[in-house]
Amino acid sequence: MELWFTEKQTKHFGITARINRTLHTEQTEFQKLDMVETEEFGNMLILDGMVMTTEKDEFVYHEMVAHVPLFTHPNPENVLIVGGGDGGVIREVLKHPSVKKATLVEIDGKVIEYSKQYLPSIAGALDNERVEVKVGDGFLHIAESENEYDVIMVDSTEPVGPAVNLFTKGFYAGISKALKEDGIFVAQTDNPWFTPELITTVFKDVKEIFPITRLYTANIPTYPSGLWTFTIGSKKHDPLEVIEERFHEIETKYYTKELHNAAFALPKFVGDLIK
């Protein structure tokens, strides 16, 4: 008998993957957590029925969250990741030698625990000496921080459950306060096919707080529609004006210095969402 997992991305559309076996399933304090082994994408982390990451395509999301803001900032030393308990963004952040400390605040400790167990190629960097892992509410951590971080990355689930507060204007204002005077922030902002209103709202809210606000995209096969967006807000540095000398060689599978600029070239229907 074949086993298949289907993520219903809308009421009428979804994606499905053949499952070899279930590695772990649990109702945590915050969400339903499933770790499964798939035929096509390797081990897959699922939260509340939504694919969070897979061994096969994880590098796209994690590289684009991390390297776009880190190469935009001239000297990022202190970095905060809100969410991201699978450890993929941390792994990419640590490729930048200027980063002296990376703090990860994940609300659900079970995500960290089982990512370490079943996604070691993604979560292995969580034990690095430059990393501080805190199990707690990222919203509250931001509220308690001021003029502390060079770059803040919000690696959250979609705006449901424990992540709902991470898509509010008040949260973005708190991020601005937590950043230093030339700080940069980035957040995943879902896809333009099924959630265009979210992109419009988030971009508008961020633009009212950050003088430089831009949208960029990446292609991620296991995320709804495959076309994913990220909103970046900066107090001083424009991601489209990064000097050539700032790029240094790091090992990546998706991100390149050419792609850095190309990612901001939006299809017209996506650009229309943020006019």
Curated annotation (Swiss-Prot):
One MF annotation (Gene Ontology) recorded for this entry: spermidine synthase activity
Pathway the protein acts in: Amine and polyamine biosynthesis; spermidine biosynthesis; spermidine from putrescine: step 1/1
Keyword flag Electron transport: no
Assembly description: Homodimer or homotetramer.
Compartments it resides in: Cytoplasm
Residue ranges of every copy of the PABS domain listed in the record: 2-235
GO biological process terms held by the UniProt record: spermidine biosynthetic process
UniProt entry keywords in alphabetical sequence: Cytoplasm, Polyamine biosynthesis, Spermidine biosynthesis, Transferase
Annotated positions binding spermidine: 62, 86, 155-158
Protein's name in the database: Polyamine aminopropyltransferase 1
